[in-house]
Curated annotation (Swiss-Prot):
Belongs to the CitD family. It comes from Pectobacterium carotovorum subsp. carotovorum (strain PC1). Keywords: Cytoplasm, Phosphoprotein. The keyword RNA-binding does not apply. Pfam families: ACP. It is found in: Cytoplasm. The keyword Cytoplasm applies. Its main location: cytoplasm. This is Citrate lyase acyl carrier protein.
């Protein structure tokens, strides 16, 4: 899935996160900022990377500002931000 424009999903509220997606040529860059990075940083990275892989995202810039979100919320916000950033023609709904 190709990211063609910038998009946002989520909020800065407690137990949520804000995901920012932007196009970038050549590589995938994921930046994660979290209040619970020491305790759950590995799990947050894993969920974000698995979600991006399932969507077929191979390049772009993904910035995650986490406020203690659960895994299901992380997946939903990443999916929403990526889908908003695509042209809508190449969505593979069965992967969601």
């Amino acid at each position: 899935m190709k990211i063609v424009k910038e998009s946002l999903a989520g909020t800065f509220e407690s137990s949520d996160l804000l995901v920012k997606v932007a196009p970038a040529d050549g590589k995938l860059t994921v930046v994660i900022n979290s209040e619970v990075m020491k305790q759950f940083g590995h799990q947050i990275k894993q969920v974000v990377n698995e979600t991006l892989a399932a969507l077929g995202v191979q390049e772009g810039t993904i910035i995650v500002d986490d406020k203690g979100a659960l895994d299901c919320v992380i997946r939903a916000r990443v999916q929403s931000a990526v889908l908003r950033a695509t042209d809508g023609q190449q969505i593979e709904w069965e992967t969601l």
